[in-house]
Amino acid sequence: YRGSTGRGDEFARLDQHAYADPEFTDILDGKLALVKDGMVDTDKVGITGGSYGGYATAWSATALSEHYAAGVMFVGISNQLSKFGTTDIPNEMQAVHARAWPWDDYQWMLETSPIYHAPKGKTPLLIMHGEADTRVHPSQSMEMYRYLKTLGNAPVRLVLYPGEGHGNRKAAAQLDYSMRLMRWMEHYLKGKGGNPPPYDLKHEEKLENGSDSES
């Protein structure tokens, strides 16, 4: 995975001003290698991640959609241009990641944004985000959701967590996130697929009923 740590400084810098490709193509290469070795079913692979991993998920569910059967995007990036105007780290974005301001390379930032590739998206995508996130503003998830919902080419769901930031801190939100992620993957990778699973979760019923037993 070009741009990751553990292989020296030069390797870690390979994703600077090189968003999405080749770094997310490296993830796909890993999937294809596992398929070639007969370890996974090529039609039953999902992808998930948070923050930059959420960006990887959104990209994979749009630009590389034919390779993934399900995706769960958490506090992720969908628009590299609008992210500059809504994040609390614009200077870090320029100095470390993009190595450019939007006015320096507008077209590149647009084309490395998942929303640009939304018409290709056929992967069922669950999007979750904290409403109080200042690092990656929840509008990033709202944009991705609205583009995919408008196109109508794949199931999409948006879940927002009140009071949560760039990662859920409260136990209830952590549980809710985990259960939604697992259910989405179960539904599309092992279940019947099609329309999304019901929005409500069983733990909500248990809380309302005051019972620990599964309904």
Residue ranges of predicted features:
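Active-site-proximal cap/loop segments of hydrolase catalytic domains
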Residues: 1-215
